């Protein structure tokens, strides 16, 4: 995911267009300004609220840490010091106007708070030696208490003990969590440093005595304190006193700015661009940006191209960063403190007559100095508005700091309450002040009172898997990946006219329609997801024409997926020709491609940093009048009517889409096209390759994972896109796409538009599958009931099954495809298959299918095939029912197994070996064969109770049967089953 933005940005104004949010006056060009970074409500991105720096530095409690300020390294040294002294003092009343006033007395009087921990990242830098603190190393932090003093100072434990040798490690917060081996290594360091510490303490005592600032007794008391006096002399910016490196950095910064001032005085913008071109540097940016790039190159040498994407680097946020794209889907993530530079001198254009440049060129040295930079501490910042301070973030990984409330019924809450308390976290019966997050169980109503209260109090609302992952990793995790945003506004039902739907936000849906001109339908939904920047945007573009007249409107709606509070919309009235011209202009601007290339599916190419159109097919080809389909009379049997209502219930599909976190606002009832799903599978296949193959370059692997994840979430818009980087997450996305395939079929076959005139009978006919209820006293019903009741596996204890209805099936054309295998192969069995309710319209219409070629080859123990079981509960697991929705559907299929290839452990294959027609995974528990029955003469029904098999070395608990040809399967019965969940 994108790194959280820093709360503040510091820079010199690039123009005189901004005004100060504090004093309301204009911020003149090149004036020092500070911007508070906030999420824009107008677009999907971050925007600065600019202020004069002097206005901010007069206030208290604004900037909590130097590391909270983006761009501080690019300021003049004097302005950098203003911010540092503001943070050190904790009050900004005098720092804005004085650069030389010492604030050490304030810092010295501040009480310090200390802690010790094992570093969870490699992002922090030691304030003493300026080296990185690597992941797994023990580090010590200090933090002054009091208003405004919220900056953390990190040190290697060894470096800290060299400065403060009398530290009682056992008294530090977090000492008990340090591994014994690390404790044993640290304790001798205290003992070794004690003699030197006594000398330093004596010197400090003598100095303080001469200065008259401390009495002798105070020094004695300090020896008994937890930390030596020397540690109190540290400034919040992290240094005991100006070191040689700090002085070098100051001198270098001043020299660099002298050069920038000369460039401003003597060199024009055009000459700066020419100079950058000659040196193969980027020429993009404002006059200030050009000046910065030229000064950097003149002083330190021209920058080489990015090693990952061959893009241009520039200095930003304390690092040299690449601003190019690793592919059309993703920005390049390369950044470094020590970039490669082109060998040789900085070049001056041959034709230049600029005397300053000519004079400078004669004096330039062939060997350039190296730029001195501070270690980047981007991971150790407070996150500004709505977040905890830096101290809290340093300890946020402890489960003891997690305070959880649960949304759901009492039975769902009780098990979680016990687990939360056992893990050491705190359970809150209701959301209140101090609650860290509200965890949503199951399908809790988004209008739930606790959820409304949590939103009012700005408490994070997260999914159950947040707690699962916290307990697994034994620490409090960030909420971002698990958040459930308010999607109540996103449940959009569309009003379809013609071949498309007018967006309801336009307010024109009642008396207008989408403009159609021949094969052209002027309606598109654009998507862009980039995990490296945090962008997850949509853009809707439509030409809307009045039903009675020729007037047209160009409608635009934009924002962030899953968040209706961010974005906006616009409706402009114009003539038809002007509307078409404006539509095409906007499409080209947003996608980098012409409308014709997309319409004709020729030469369309995704462009870096641009949107991608999504295929949305509303599944309707004619205009219809509004009617309630379920209220009309039907010729179907009552039990079949209830089944059809289950299959065609829009809320079932809506709930599935919500479970998958699909953006339902801009994908009305998730009508993704087959093309999008196919492209989603292709992205997952690439992710699978990256996860399974060893890569010697972790940075490149991470960038490629970001790129493939961007492709996936652009094709399949999600409320919470993230980097897919582990096997479980990957498999869940594969299952999601498999389910979406059937939702796509259901939407295309049945349609979910509210104005449909189709009755249940009409929808039933479109399934092309004859479905007949079985009488409960029939022989087939009793056999199936016995099969269900006797084959429940002993380990599946979470629920029991109750048979409600059985329907005989006859899919159109299926018997003819199956007949040759029925006669030729033999060895036929009646076997179980379970699936989500949302998959059954697709199954009844098209039969059981094998995963497509573009789907990743994972999650399939024995390859891509159709899987069956002889124990009912083995298949029932895949119905994914719950207490609120306890009724599921299951299949009994006649399967022509032929010669079986038997295995005791997983082995991927595209098809069984020569001479074999199916695969069987041998389980440790099997149905008792003496109780098997025959159906229709030669079809085996393995309806015996589970017993131990003779196979002892198998990795499988229960039998699995796999065929690799759909023609070997004939659907026979559909079962309506009630799951009686026990918890």
Curated annotation (Swiss-Prot):
Residues 197-246, 369-397 are annotated as: Disordered. It catalyses: NAD(+) + (ADP-D-ribosyl)n-acceptor = nicotinamide + (ADP-D-ribosyl)n+1-acceptor + H(+); L-aspartyl-[protein] + NAD(+) = 4-O-(ADP-D-ribosyl)-L-aspartyl-[protein] + nicotinamide; L-glutamyl-[protein] + NAD(+) = 5-O-(ADP-D-ribosyl)-L-glutamyl-[protein] + nicotinamide. One of its GO terms (cellular component) is nucleus. Zn(2+) 2 binds at residues 126, 129, 156, 159. Induction: By ionising radiation (IR)-induced DNA damage. SMART domains: BRCT (SM00292), PADR1 (SM01335), WGR (SM00773), zf-PARP (SM01336). Residues 301-345 are annotated as: Zinc ribbon. It is found in: Nucleus. GO terms for molecular function: DNA binding; NAD binding; NAD+ poly-ADP-ribosyltransferase activity; NAD+-protein-aspartate ADP-ribosyltransferase activity; NAD+-protein-glutamate ADP-ribosyltransferase activity; nucleotidyltransferase activity; zinc ion binding. A zinc finger (PARP-type) spans 8-91, 114-194. Zn(2+) 3 binds at residues 306, 309, 322, 332. Residues 236-375 form the PADR1 zinc-binding domain. Residues 394-484 form the BRCT domain. Belongs to the ARTD/PARP family. This is Poly [ADP-ribose] polymerase 1. It comes from Arabidopsis thaliana (Mouse-ear cress). The gene is PARP1.
């Amino acid at each position: 995911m994108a790194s959280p933005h820093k709360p503040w940005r510091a820079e010199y104004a690039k123009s005189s267009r901004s005004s100060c949010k504090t004093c309301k006056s204009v911020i003149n060009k090149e004036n020092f300004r500070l911007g508070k970074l906030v999420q824009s409500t107008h677009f999907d991105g971050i925007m600065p609220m600019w202020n004069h720096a002097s206005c901010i530095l007069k206030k208290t409690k604004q900037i909590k840490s130097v590391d909270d300020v983006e761009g501080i390294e690019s300021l003049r040294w004097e302005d950098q010091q203003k911010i540092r002294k503001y943070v050190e003092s904790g009050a900004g009343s005098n720092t804005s106007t004085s650069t030389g006033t010492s604030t050490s007395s304030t810092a010295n009087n501040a009480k310090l708070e200390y802690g010790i921990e094992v570093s969870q990242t490699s992002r922090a830098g030691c304030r003493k030696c300026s080296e990185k603190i690597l992941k797994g190393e023990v580090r010590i932090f200090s933090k002054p208490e009091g208003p405004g003093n919220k900056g953390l100072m990190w040190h290697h434990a060894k470096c800290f003990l060299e400065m403060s040798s009398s530290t009682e490690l056992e008294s530090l917060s977090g000492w008990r969590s340090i591994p014994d081996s690390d404790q044993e290594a640290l304790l001798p360091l205290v003992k070794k440093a004690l003699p030197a510490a006594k000398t330093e303490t004596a010197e400090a005592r003598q100095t303080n005595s001469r200065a008259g600032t401390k009495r002798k007794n105070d020094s004695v008391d300090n020896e008994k304190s937890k930390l030596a006096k020397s540690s109190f002399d540290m400034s919040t910016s992290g240094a005991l006193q100006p070191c040689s490196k700090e002085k070098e950095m100051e001198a270098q910064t001043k020299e660099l700015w002298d050069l920038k001032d000369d460039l401003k005085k003597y060199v024009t913008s055009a000459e700066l661009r020419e100079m950058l071109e000659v040196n193969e540097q980027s020429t993009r940016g404002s006059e200030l940006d050009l000046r910065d790039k030229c000064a950097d190159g003149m002083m330190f040498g021209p920058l080489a191209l990015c090693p990952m994407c061959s893009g241009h680097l520039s200095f930003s946020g304390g690092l040299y960063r690449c601003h190019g794209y690793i592919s059309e889907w993703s920005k390049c993530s390369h950044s470094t403190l020590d970039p490669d530079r082109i060998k040789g001198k900085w070049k001056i254009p041959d034709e230049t007559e600029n005397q300053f440049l000519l004079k400078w060129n004669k004096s330039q040295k062939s060997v350039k100095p190296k730029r001195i930079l501070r270690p980047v501490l981007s991971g150790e910042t407070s996150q500004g508005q709505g977040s905890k301070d830096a101290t809290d973030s340093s300890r946020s990984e402890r489960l003891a700091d997690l305070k959880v409330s649960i949304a759901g019924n009492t039975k769902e809450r009780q098990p979680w309450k016990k687990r939360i308390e056992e893990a050491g976290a705190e359970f809150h019966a209701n959301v209140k002040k101090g609650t860290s997050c509200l965890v949503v169980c199951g399908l809790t109503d988004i209008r739930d009172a606790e959820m409304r209260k949590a939103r009012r109090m700005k408490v994070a609302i997260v999914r159950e898997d947040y707690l699962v992952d916290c307990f697994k990793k034994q620490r409090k995790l960030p909420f971002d990946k698990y958040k459930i945003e308010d999607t109540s506004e996103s449940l959009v039902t569309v009003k379809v006219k013609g071949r498309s739907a007018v967006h309801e936000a336009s307010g024109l849906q009642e008396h207008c329609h989408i403009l159609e001109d021949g094969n052209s339908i002027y309606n598109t939904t654009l998507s862009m997801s980039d995990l490296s920047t945090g962008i997850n945007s949509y853009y809707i573009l439509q030409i809307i024409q009045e039903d009675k007249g020729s007037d047209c409107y160009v409608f635009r709606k934009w924002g962030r997926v899953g968040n209706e509070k961010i974005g906006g919309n616009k409706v402009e009235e114009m003539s038809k020709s002007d509307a078409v011209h404006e539509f095409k202009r906007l499409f080209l601007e947003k996608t980098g491609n012409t409308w014709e290339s997309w319409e004709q599916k020729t030469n369309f190419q995704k462009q870096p940093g641009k949107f991608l159109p999504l295929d949305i097919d509303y599944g309707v080809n004619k205009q219809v009048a509004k009617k309630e389909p379920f209220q009309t009379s039907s010729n179907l049997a009552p039990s079949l009517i209830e089944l059809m209502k289950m299959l065609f219930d829009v809320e079932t599909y809506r709930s599935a889409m919500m479970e998958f976190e699909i953006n339902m606002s801009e994908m009305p009832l998730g009508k993704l096209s087959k093309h999008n799903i196919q492209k989603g599978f292709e992205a997952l296949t690439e992710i699978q390759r990256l996860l399974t193959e060893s890569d010697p370059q972790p940075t490149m692997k991470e960038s490629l994972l970001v790129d493939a994840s961007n492709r996936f979430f652009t094709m399949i818009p999600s409320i919470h896109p993230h980097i897919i980087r582990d096997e479980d997450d990957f498999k869940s996305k594969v299952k999601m796409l498999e389910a979406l395939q059937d939702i796509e079929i259901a939407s295309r076959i049945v349609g979910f538009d509210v104005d449909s005139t189709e009755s249940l009978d009409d929808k039933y006919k479109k399934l092309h599958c004859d479905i007949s209820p079985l009488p409960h006293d029939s022989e087939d019903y009793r056999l199936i009931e016995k099969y269900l009741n006797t084959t429940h596996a002993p380990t599946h204890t979470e629920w029991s099954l109750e048979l409600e209805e059985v329907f005989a099936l006859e899919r159109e054309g299926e018997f003819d495809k199956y007949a040759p295998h029925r006669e030729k192969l033999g060895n036929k069995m009646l076997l179980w298959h379970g699936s989500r309710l949302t998959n059954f319209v697709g199954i009844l219409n098209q039969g059981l299918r094998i995963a497509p070629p573009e789907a990743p080859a994972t999650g399939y123990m024995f390859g891509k095939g159709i899987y069956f079981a002889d124990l009912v509960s083995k298949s029932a697991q895949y119905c994914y029912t719950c207490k609120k929705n306890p009724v599921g559907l299951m299949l009994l299929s006649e399967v022509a197994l032929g010669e079986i290839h038997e295995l005791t452990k997983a082995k991927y294959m595209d098809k069984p070996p020569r001479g074999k027609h199916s695969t069987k995974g041998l389980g440790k528990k099997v149905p008792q064969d003496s109780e098997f029955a025959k159906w229709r003469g030669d079809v085996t029904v393995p309806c015996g109770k589970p017993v131990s098999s003779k196979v002892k070395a198998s990795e499988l608990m229960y039998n699995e049967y796999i065929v690799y040809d759909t023609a070997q399967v004939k659907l026979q019965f559909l079962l309506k089953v009630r799951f009686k969940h026990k918890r």
